[in-house]
């Protein structure tokens, strides 16, 4: 049945359970064997076990063994798939031929398997015994085209020669050849210990049917000898060995190697090595190794770069590496380990280099994880060398690393440079407030390197980092202006020199009071003082006679306080003006010193000489308001610029409470200046005087200031000190101390900007208006005075006067605020009066704005030499609006 046509693969499984002979026949003296022959394939021999098992039946020989082989059959061969099974009696000697005991034919049909007992018939067709056999013929599909075609009958099936999974004896050379010959055969080894077996013997090729009637001994012996040659050597049961017919044994041996390789490749089950941590390199597919090695070729250099840095800088990455080591430790990585191990890595951790290196390789092959680690290293300012593989979407993470020489500084270099510049400026400006707050000879250090730390932990609302950064982005020009102000403030601090420390609220009050008092009396005492401020102060001091003596003194004190207050307001809006009045004596003394020190400021004020009457009346009004209820407001044209707040009428203090109403003229004046000079003056003062959030917030919202402002009016002694001339020194000292103290005491206070919120101010103004209508009337009168004072100021048009007026406005504003802070009623009443005065005096205020804008701009340009500082006028204008329009707030 040889054919070259492509056949189909079949699996034949045979299991002999037992063989029983008839009673008349004695068991085979020699070892019995069952031979199966199918078509022209070599016979399959099944031998009983060496140690016979229990007999299933009386007189039965227990086998319990079988064979299994793969066959390639042409479809035509399936027309009569008969299996011949024969019971043979093996000869005792090697020379004697085996004897045939009985045989039977079994019809093979591809099926799931059948079990049956078949009758064995002897040569004469007599019944000689029974064969219990299980057989199964399974079609496996078309034969693989890759299997080489063999010469001759290519359909001989493998003869499985050994039993049970063990081969007790080595195979002979003859046996080995047929075994390798099983080209297409795959040994599906049958379970050996199955008890139910069936057997069959293939029909001899020469005889179409090998029936019991065939008594040709030669044929039987021939096929039997062939079977013995293949299987006698093996006493095992199930070891499979492909066998070929004797005629083609040599030809098959030439192809045996190819078949063996095919068997190994196709029959080897290799589970994915990914699921196993301890795989040997031999089991790793070559393709897999190549894929893994590709990305790792350039890694050793990178690893050397990465790990020294990571090792030294970011130890947290080590546990990550160790945890990944077990996962990544795989044969693909092992070949590269000796190369990839970096010098720094060996010292990095006790882990062996393989364990250490494998996680690195794993990370490199995981772009997202690698990017995450690099991003973390960047956040820690510890950049890692650029990895070999960078995900295209993550390339931006690695750009900054290659730029700088030092990986730790690469990521932060741009931001640090900016922040360093800002911090240097900021520190310098922070030093200025400190020097003012710490006047004890510390100001000389301002020009030096920034202080290592801010000692008192104050919030210095100078040019803060936040403000600097914000201005840098939004308004660079304004940033330049602020920096100039910082420099100017620094120079003023140096000029002021050491100053006396006063309690925060006392210092603030005294500084403001001293400034307000000192401004009028200094001119009186020292009208020819080198400071340009003195003439205007003299004019202002001349005004007090117009008012009652007490009033004039109070007004002078309030005026000096207003001038100092204006500086304080610029510095930080120290305590309420009344508090300043209470401590006018100290402030006046300080202001005397300050005048000598701050000659530049005084000189700027000195040039303009305004009618003393207008300025003094307002100050006297303030002092009188402290002493009693005053509705009279005297405009101070001479001090108009410096004392817009002084011009603001001091509303009648209800129940002896000082009610300070900032005149609408002052408000309007402050407003025109506000857009240019008001911002400049306020910002200058704030930055220049070491403005601190506490002081600023105190002026706006501190209740302490209110309580302090109550005693503040009792500053008649302050007025006297102003007359003595020590007011200047005290006022300057009080300013500095007030700034420091106010910052300390009012550190809890709300920020200045929040205090100036229009909503809250409107609410307060309404409540204050409702609370005190009399104060509103007084404020109206004050607004009239302020308008008159504005007209006088216009006539004067003196830049020094404008500066003095700004100071006066600031001081008066502070006085108002303090009076309002002393008591809610007081605060309400002055604020209400401020609002009322502001409303009626809108025209005058507008005029004042125009005048103040021109005068203050000129004055600040002369005094500070900073024409760009006119922006402070805007701030001033806003402050004026807040103070006057919104009585609840003071600037």
From Swiss-Prot:
GO terms for cellular component: centrosome; cytoplasmic microtubule; midbody; mitotic spindle midzone; mitotic spindle pole. Its main location: cytoplasm. GO terms for molecular function: microtubule binding. Residues 577-592, 645-658 have a biased composition (Basic and acidic residues). It is found in: Cytoplasm, Cytoskeleton; Cytoplasm, Cytoskeleton, Spindle pole; Cytoplasm, Cytoskeleton, Microtubule organizing center, Centrosome; Midbody. Residues 407-417 have a biased composition (Low complexity). This is Microtubule-associated protein 10. It comes from Mus musculus. The lineage of its organism: Eukaryota, Metazoa, Chordata, Craniata, Vertebrata. The gene is Map10.
